[in-house]
């Protein structure tokens, strides 16, 4: 009898540990459900189902929702404050004020087919400020002069070098492409130097980039559309790439060209500081310089209101590339009240899907005739 009571006590203790009573999640958390293909193939609904799928699919779904919030926001959604200007009290004006979107990306994405998606966004003026690396400038221009090809990640470097082929992941860029780039760009540098001397033009990286977008005059180029739509493109590391090589070569041929980075740091910080009364949103593909430059500019206004990071970097080495949005909150680069998410995914996979369900979907909806 005593042994039986002991067994019952043990079982009761085990049950209390193993079957601990749960706090109800009904109404507070989304239920995990995937897409049901019995409903047919509906790509928009498949993307909408990501948010309830789990893991990085849910992060992608959250990113889609965050970008749509950026695109939907209007000043009219906010309460009128006592200290706002008369113009800001006007309902028509308030409805016209949209979120200011900063787009950042690394050069490899311009080497890839994501270039065409970025060109689409810039062509239709869907973003307001761009930050990229030098490769993100030169690769766009070079693709107007010659093609990039699909290769393999495993191709041996020594063999490729002997053939004059450069590998970017599983992409191949013939070395001849850079020769064509040199032939195209050096005369432009000559013209810029002449204008510097004759007209006292003080070039900055963003002014130089705008000039290159004008000179390339090619609708496949996102820089061309940035020039056409007056969207600033910032590149603080302008010398770190083939473009830097060309500037270096130009110093031997025709020395004296000056490019001032100080004007540009004032310009990009001003883009954030003077954004008010607009909210600001950040969409950053990859890490490094573009990620930090955009975040740091938004720190000047006490943080961005929306943030979407898409990259595969980890935070455990303390790198800015791998840092989650919450780390940026600690620096004041993202507001504590902001809607933010990081998608741990190759941007060549995630970004086209995100654009399809945000920017492109809204543009398509606006083009549909009203019934």
From Swiss-Prot:
Binding site for spermidine: 138-139, 245, 292, 318-320, 327-333
Full protein name: Deoxyhypusine synthase
E.C. no: 2.5.1.46
Gene from which the chain derives: DHS1
Binding site for NAD(+): 107-111, 133-135, 139, 240, 287, 312-313, 346-347
A GO-annotated cellular component: cytoplasm
Pfam families (UniProt xref): DS
Biological role: Catalyzes the NAD-dependent oxidative cleavage of spermidine and the subsequent transfer of the butylamine moiety of spermidine to the epsilon-amino group of a specific lysine residue of the eIF-5A precursor protein to form the intermediate deoxyhypusine residue. Also able to produce homospermidine from putrescine.
Domain of life: Eukaryota
InterPro entries in UniProt: Deoxyhypusine_synthase, Deoxyhypusine_synthase_sf, DHS-like_NAD/FAD-binding_dom
Catalyzed reactions per annotation: [eIF5A protein]-L-lysine + spermidine = [eIF5A protein]-deoxyhypusine + propane-1,3-diamine
Keywords from the UniProt entry: Hypusine biosynthesis, NAD, Transferase
Pathway: Protein modification; eIF5A hypusination
GO terms of molecular function: deoxyhypusine synthase activity
